[in-house]
Amino acid sequence: MCYGYWKKNIHLKESNFSVFFRKNPFNSGYAVCCGLEFIIDYLNNIKFTDSDINYLKSLKSDDGNNLFDKEFLKFLKSFKFSCDVEAIEEGRVIFSNEPIINIRGPIYQCQLVESAIINMFNFNTLIATKASRMSLSSKGDTILEFGLRRAQGIDGSLSASRASYIGGTSKTSNVLAGKLFDIPVSGTHSHSWVLAFDSELESFKKYAEVMPNNCILLIDTFNTMDGLDNAIFVAKELEKINKKLLGVRIDSGDLAYLSKKARAKLDKNGLEYVKIVASNDLDEFLIKSLKNQKSKISVWGIGTKLVTAYDNPSLGAVYKLTALKNSDGNWDKKIKLSEQKIKINNPGINQILRFKKKELFGGDMIYDSTNEKIGDKMIDPNDSTRFKKFNKKYSYEKLLIKIFEKGKLIYKCPDLKSIKQRLEDDLLMLDNSHKRLENPHSYPVGIEENLYKEKKKMILNLRK
C-alpha cells in the first residue's frame, strides 16, 4: 500500500488512524493497556537499512520484473518517522471500541507501521489482562509467572513476562526477563532434580545446601505426603543453622485436599511460616475454585494458561483510517460501513473523557477532539435509547496523551513498578461489578452526542 500511495502521489496526504478492539478479551469487564513501550521503541528506531533496501530490490512481480521502482526504494532509504502519536498509557484499564492509539501524519507512514503496532498491542494487552484476572481471583496472594517453557517463542516469553508483571504477577522464573525489565525473579527445582539423587530426602538436603535462603521443595515426585515428611525434616535442619524453608510446592493431584493436609502437618511441626505453592495448569477460574474450597495455597505458580492467553489467544485489535486532511487544511472524517454494526468505526480524530465520581470511574465518553463543542451526554452506540449525562459532580481526565510530536518522542516511559501501581490504582476505582470473572456488569462507554449524530448522518448518506 505504501508503494501504491507513492505511485499515485498521495503518499504525503495527512491522515489519522486509530487502534481499537471490538470485544473485551476473556469475556472480561475490562482490559489492561499494555505494549506501548515496545511500540515507542519501534517507532523511535524505524528505518530502512541497506540490507532492507537490497532485499526489497530483489523482489519480483509475477511477470518477472522488479516489484518496486528504484526511485521508490531511494525514497524509502531516506525514510524518517514524522507522525504525531497519542496513546493511552500502559497500566490503564481500557474497554472495547475506545481509541487506544491515534497515529497522525503522512498516510504512507501511518500505513507502514500498522502491523507492528497491532502486534505489540494485541499480545501484551491480552497477557496483562489475563494476569490481572488471575491476580484478582487470588485475592492478593503471590503469583509466580512460570511461563517460559510454554510461551510462543523466546520473544513471546519475554513479552509475556513483562505484561504478566504489569498485570499482577509478583515474580518471574524467566531470568532474562528479570534482567531486561527489572522484574523480581524466583523459581523452584523440577522433578529431575529429585530423580538425579539416590533418594528424595537426599535431593532435598542437597538443594537446601545450595539454596539455604531461597529453598522451595517440590514434594510430589513420588508421593506428596511422603515428600512433605522429607521437606519437614529438611526444614528442621535449616532451623538449626538459623535458616527457614520458604515453601513446599505441589504440582499434581487434588490441590485443595493436599494443601489442607500439608498445612495441618506443617503447623503441627511448628512450621507455620512455610508457604504452600501450587502449580499445574492453573487459571483464574481454578484459583477461584480452590479459594472457594478453602485450600491452604498462598503462592500460585502459573504458566501455560497465562502466557498463551489460553482461552482467548487473539485480542483482535484493528487499525482504521478515521480522517484525511483536505486541500483546505481541514479534516474530513472517514467511516467504514459493514453489515455488522460492531464493525462500523467511529469517524474523526477522537479522544476519551473518563469521568470519576466518589472515587469510582463513572464512564468513558468518546468525542471528536477537533470539535470545540463537547456535550455532557453520551449515547450507547448499540442502543440510542440508552444514554448517560455527566453533571458537575463528576471530574474527568483525558485518556490519550501525546507520545510523539512530528516524529519526536516527547514522552518518558515510566518504570514497570510505576505502571503496575497505575493499574492497581485504576482497579481500585473500577466498581467490583465490572471485575467479576463471569458475567461482569458492562462499564459505561458511549459516544458524545454530537459525534453520535454526525456518525449516524454519515452512515445514512453513504447508504442512500
Predicted regions and their residues:
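Ordered alpha/beta subdomains of enzyme catalytic regions
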Residues: 1-213, 244, 319-464
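Glycine-rich phosphate/ribose-binding loops and adjacent secondary-structure elements
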Residues: 192-367
